[in-house]
A protein has these predicted regions:
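N-terminal phosphate-binding loop and flanking beta/alpha elements of the actin-like ATPase fold
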Residues: 1-38, 43-185
Length: 186
C-alpha cells in the first residue's frame, strides 16, 4: 500500500496532525484521545525527556526544566538549556514531531515516513529549512512546507495538488505574492 502521508501543524503552543482518508480529513488523536499536543519539551529530575502533556505538567512544577515557544527561534542557532541538556529549537521541534509521528503510527496502524508541514507565512527560507531538518531528525521526510493554517486540512494524497482549504481565510495564490520564499510550494 501507499505509505501514509500526514499533515502536521507544528504550532507555537500546540501541534496537531491529520490525514486524508476516504475523501475527508481525519484528525489524528494521541493514545489518550487528545488531538492537540502541547508544543512543550521538558527534562524531568531523572533526565528523561518529556513532550506534550507530560511536559506541560512538568512546567507547572519546575518551569526551568521546560522549553516552549521555541518554534519562532527555528533557524537562529539559539540554544535552550534544560536541566543541563542543551537543545537547538530544531531538536525541540523534532521531539514534538516524533511524538506526533508515534501517535499517528499507533492510530493508523502503519508506518508514517512522510509529512506535509505547515509553518507561518512569515517564516523565511532559513526557518523553512530548519523545519525540514527537524522533520528529518524525527524520522520524517518533509516533502512540502506550506503556509498555515493549512496542513491539517490539506493533508496531501499522492500527487494531489494543494488547493484552497474551504473555510480558510486565504488562498495560496494570495500568499504566494506576499511571500517570496515559496519555492517549496507545489
Amino acid at each position: 500500500g501507499i505509505m501514509a502521508v500526514i499533515g502536521i501543524d507544528l504550532g507555537t503552543t500546540n501541534s496537531l496532525a491529520a490525514i486524508w482518508r476516504e475523501q475527508k480529513v481525519i484528525l489524528i488523536p494521541d493514545e489518550s484521545g487528545n488531538y492537540m499536543i502541547p508544543s512543550i519539551v521538558a527534562v524531568d529530575q531523572n533526565g528523561n525527556i518529556l513532550t506534550g502533556y507530560a511536559a506541560r505538567e512538568e512546567e507547572l512544577i519546575d518551569p526551568g526544566r521546560c522549553a516552549s515557544n521555541f518554534k519562532r527561534f527555528m533557524g537562529t542557532g539559539k540554544y535552550y538549556d534544560l536541566a543541563g541538556q542543551k537543545f537547538l529549537p530544531e531538536e525541540l521541534s523534532a521531539l514534538i514531531l516524533k511524538r506526533i509521528k508515534e501517535a499517528a503510527e499507533t492510530f493508523l496502524g502503519e508506518e508514517v515516513t512522510e509529512a506535509v508541514i505547515s509553518v507561518p507565512a512569515y517564516f523565511n527560507s532559513h526557518q523553512r529549512y530548519a523545519t525540514k531538518l527537524a522533520a528529518q531528525l524525527a524520522g520524517i521526510a518533509c516533502e512540502r512546507i506550506i503556509n498555515e493554517p493549512s496542513a491539517a486540512a490539506l493533508t496531501a494524497r499522492e500527487k494531489e495538488k494543494i488547493g484552497k482549504y474551504e473555510g480558510g481565510e486565504s488562498t495560496l495564490e494570495n500568499e504566494e505574492e506576499e511571500t517570496p520564499d515559496q519555492y517549496m510550494l507545489v
